[in-house]
Regions:
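N-terminal Rossmann-like FAD-binding beta1-loop-alpha1 element of flavoenzymes
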Residues: 1-20
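Short, solvent-exposed loop/turn segments at secondary-structure junctions
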Residues: 3, 25-27, 37-38, 60-62, ...
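Conserved beta-strand scaffold positions in the cores of enzyme catalytic domains, especially
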Residues: 20, 54, 92, 148-151
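Short aromatic-enriched loop/helix-cap "lid" or pocket-rim segments at secondary-structure transitions
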Residues: 30-34, 106, 140
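Structural signal for hydrophobic/aromatic residues that build the beta-strand cores
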Residues: 31, 57, 79, 111, ...
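Glycine-rich dinucleotide-binding loop and its adjacent helix/turn
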Residues: 65-67, 71-75, 129-168
Length: 168
């Protein structure tokens, strides 16, 4: 996501050996719109609520053709352009789930990942967490007799399924 690519850029620029893991298949985090319920993403009409001038990275301005309040497509393109411009793709392992990070007695980190149903364990001297904390919904249990449809915002992708319905 956006925090991960800036961390990769800044750490690699000072000469550190960087390895990143991303559950998605490309750079963009939640800004990659996808209708699959398993994918945490923005919904189809999302625009950022801050202006592009306040939201851009200081070393990589938005294209002048981008809307003042960019859409999710414009943001995804921006983050992918940033990653290409600074050659960050080489550091990222896509389609990889970070399952566990454990600090060891020698202050190193044991990181367990999974890619294509294959688990891998590696040890690192340092750990930077730029996790997508919105990827797995937290659904509280409510007491009562509600018999309607209950969905988490994680599954909300577009408004059309709710047309002519009463929604709370």
């Amino acid at each position: 996501g956006p925090s991960g690519i800036t961390a990769i850029k800044n750490l690699s620029e000072i000469g550190l050996n960087v390895k990143a893991f991303d559950f998605n298949s490309d750079v963009g985090g939640n800004w990659i719109y996808n209708e699959k319920e398993s994918h945490s993403s923005v919904f189809e009409t999302t625009h950022i609520i801050s202006s592009k001038s306040l939201s851009q990275y200081e070393d990589f301005p938005f294209n002048s053709k981008v809307s003042d309040y960019p859409s999710h497509d414009e943001l995804r393109d921006y983050f992918q352009s940033y990653a290409k411009h600074f050659n960050l793709y080489q550091y990222i392992n896509f389609n990889t789930l970070v399952k566990n990070c454990i600090k060891l007695k020698d202050n190193k980190w044991k990181v367990t990942t999974e890619c294509n149903n294959v688990e891998n364990i590696e040890t690192f001297s340092d750990l930077v967490v730029c996790n997508g904390h919105h990827w797995q919904p937290n659904i509280p249990k409510y007491k009562g007799n509600f018999d309607g449809v209950f969905i988490h915002s994680h599954k909300y992708k577009k408004a059309s399924p709710f047309k002519n319905k009463k929604v709370l």
